[in-house]
Amino acid sequence: MQQQIIKELHVSQMVEPKEEIRKRVTFLKNYLKHSGAKGYVLGLSGGQDSTLAGKLAQMAIDELNEEEQDTSYVFIAVRLPYGVQKDEADAQDAIAFIKPSRSITVNIKDAVDASTKSFEQATGEVLSDFNKGNTKARERMKAQYDVGAHYGCLVIGTDHAAEAITGFFTKHGDGACDVAPLFGLTKRQGKSLLKELGAPTHLYTKAPTADLEDDRPGLPDEEALGLTYEQLDDYLEGKQVHDAIRKKIESRYLATEHKRQLPVTIFDSWWK
């Protein structure tokens, strides 16, 4: 099953950072021109994935604007805090590194709290902290699509191979996007691209966190997954991993297949 998953997720055992950067920037340029859109939108958290996706997007925009003098493409970085983000300084460091065409902030707290209150008034029950976390992720994506629709831009997602294999994203939240420039990269490969790009070291060495749950703020991804990114990357790059780890990864992959598919129809058989 390991080789099948590697193939399905388009993972290469090794990447050359300069070549990979060029390939993905070119992809973003070509798809934007094909789409007829005016630019890209991305929610920027200050973590590794959005920093990398944002830098690639801004590089694509800068090159397009230099090559096509009669157009003016934009990359809009969107800050999406729930109240006050504890690592806001990292987000600002990411913005300083990327130098987006434009940066705006949409605080999602009022919208999320209103949605939570409406649910609880309608059902008479308390929305779990975990489900409220998913509401945050979906509200963030909704806000990005609002910005994208208003300015005629496409929404960028940050899904990569280590998230895809585990389904470690919110369905119709951070899993929703128009274009996914990091797809096929492992976590360590993403780090190598950021190193090549000269990103501030702390943006890709800090512990990754979705930071969605109020009861467990800053919960590290690896703790939530019960797997380390090193284990996931080793598996995805075709290396041998402990049998118990392999089984855990493959079990999670199968259990989250619905997240990697379009809504199931009567004509689909992948679930059988």
Swiss-Prot record:
Organism: Halalkalibacterium halodurans (strain ATCC BAA-125 / DSM 18197 / FERM 7344 / JCM 9153 / C-125) (Bacillus halodurans)
Complexes and interactors: Homodimer.
Biological function: Catalyzes the ATP-dependent amidation of deamido-NAD to form NAD. Uses ammonia as a nitrogen source.
Highest taxon of the lineage: Bacteria
Positions that bind deamido-NAD(+): 138, 171, 178, 258-259
Catalysed reactions, semicolon-separated: deamido-NAD(+) + NH4(+) + ATP = AMP + diphosphate + NAD(+) + H(+)
Enzyme class, UniProt record, top EC level: ligase
Family: Belongs to the NAD synthetase family.
UniProt keyword terms in alphabetical order: ATP-binding, Ligase, Magnesium, Metal-binding, NAD, Nucleotide-binding
UniProt protein name: NH(3)-dependent NAD(+) synthetase
Statement: the UniProt record of this protein carries the keyword Metal-binding: yes
Any one Gene Ontology BP term: NAD biosynthetic process
Source organism phylogeny: Bacteria, Bacillati, Bacillota, Bacilli, Bacillales
UniProt-listed Enzyme Commission number(s): 6.3.1.5
Binding site residues for Mg(2+): 49, 163
UniProt-annotated binding residues for ATP: 43-50, 158, 187, 209
GO molecular function, one term: glutaminase activity
Biochemical pathway: Cofactor biosynthesis; NAD(+) biosynthesis; NAD(+) from deamido-NAD(+) (ammonia route): step 1/1
Gene encoding the protein: nadE
GO cellular component, one term: cytoplasm
